[in-house]
Structure formats: structure tokens, C-alpha cells
Amino acid sequence: ASDVYKRQVADVVNNDRSINGKLKVVFIEDYRVSNAEILFAAADVSEQISTASKEASGTGNMKFMLNGAPTLGTMDGANVEIVHEVGEENAFIFGLSSQEVINYENNGGYNPTDVYFNDWEIKRVVDQLMDGTYSNGDHNMYINLYNSLLNTQCTDKADTYFILKDFRSYADAQKRVEEAYRDEAGWAKNCLLYTSPSPRDTR
């Protein structure tokens, strides 16, 4: 997304009185190593949310891990190795597996409009792309994104990154994070697990 789109989403979230003091969107401009060092050390959770099989493996998630931030993510890239080290019960995994994504791509069987019409929260979010919520009343600003999610005007297949398919699973993972965070001792233990040598290395 362009910087303009990110700022528009931030403006909506940051001016929502219902979540004032609880949630804020901050767009980090000129992202570089010096900024990253602060973020890695300060993060409570490392969100690595690329669609399984779609993302080249990077090192950012490892740096969050070494600073004690539990992983919320898909089984993609280096997340697979992190989960292998800490145990799946100590991570917050969501979404399709790589094989499931590949099967849908090769054999079909996924229609994002089914998700859209059967999950009112997802429908509400997608509809907001067109009702001007995030674009100061401009109903056409996000039309390409809207079309790419629900029809084939922009791509050969709709929702090629399975965003709508993974969304409910992502929301459920966020709830698991919230529940785990309320257990202060358990959360601290999990954070220490992420920073310590893995059992495989200490045998």
C-alpha cells in the first residue's frame, strides 16, 4: 500500500474514541536499522502474516524472536523454523498451510465471495473500502483493492493471497494472544523461551 493509504487507515483508527488509549497506528517513515533496533526491543508480539508459500524468508522475525517477542503468524518462511524451535503451542499460528494454498491454486475450490457473504465482520471491512471510510468520502480510491478481493477485474483469480480466507483464523489468533497476555507469568515464561537456546541445541 502507498504511504497515503497507510496514513488514511491510521487517521481512522487513531481518531476512534472507542479505542482511545488502547490502540494506535504509527507509520514508521524512513525505516532503517536504527529504527528497527528500537522496534525489535520494544515489541510484545512479532506479527509475520504473509500468506503461506508466498513470502521469501527474511530475518526480521528472528530478531523479534531473540528480543523475546512471541510469533503470531502463518507457517511461512522462517516462521517454520521458529515454531520448530519454540514449539507450536508457544506460538500463535493461523491461516492456510503452504500445501493448502498450493492445492487451491492448482485445483480451485476457493471462492472469496462465499467468505464475504457468510462472515458479517469481513463483509463490513470489505464494504468500508468502497463507502469512503478510509478515503475521506472518495468511493473509488480503493476500487482496485476491492475488485482484487472479490472478482476477476484485476487478476485472473480473486483474492490470490487468500486474505479473506485467512482473516477469521487471524482474528482468532489475536484472541489467543489477548488471553495469553493476561497470564503475566505464563507470558513472561514464553518470552524467555524465545530468547533462550532451543531444546534441540542443548541436548
Model regions and ranges:
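Nucleotide-activated donor-binding/catalytic signature segment of Leloir-type glycosyltransferases, i.e.
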Residues: 3-33
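Short, basic, glycine/proline-bearing loop/turn elements
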Residues: 21, 46-47
